[in-house]
Amino acid sequence: MSQNEAYEPGPDRGLERTPPQDLNAERGVLGGMMLSKDAIADVVERVKSTDFYRPAHEVIFESITDLYSRGEPADLVTVSDELTKKGELARVGGGAYLADLIDMVPTAANAGFYADIVVERATLRRLVEAGTRIVQLGYAADGGEVVEALNS
C-alpha cells in the first residue's frame, strides 16, 4: 500500500454513512398508532413528525395525528382515506404498506417504547448534522461567520 492509499477513504472509513435511524421502530410506532387510540396519545407526547427518518413515515404520522386531533379514528381505513384525499397514498407505499405496518406490530402497547427509539435516533441525527455544520464552519474561509455562529 502506498503512502497516498493510506489516506484515501476506505469502505469502512465511511464518509457516506447512513444517518442514525431505526426503520423497524418507526414502523412499530405507526402500526401501533393505527391499532390503538391509547398508543396515539402516548406517542404524540414524545414524537414529532420530523423525528422520522423515512419521509413516508413522516407523512403517515401526520395523517394519523390529524385524524386524532379531529377526534376521528385512525385505523387502516381512515388513514388510507386521509392519505388518498391528500394525494399521498401511493407515495407512502399504498394501502398494502399501511396494512404491513399494522401486521408487523406484536402489540400496540409497545408503541411508546418504539417511540423512544425513534426520538433517540432523531436526536443522534441532529447531533451529526450539528457536528457536520461545525466542521464546515471550521473550514470556511471567513472566520467572522464562525464567530457569529459560536456566539448565537
Name the predicted role of every residue range.
Residues 100-152:
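Interdomain "pre-motor" coupling segment immediately N-terminal to P-loop NTPase/helicase cores
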Residues 1-122:
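Noncatalytic partner-interaction/assembly domains of nucleic-acid and motor enzyme complexes
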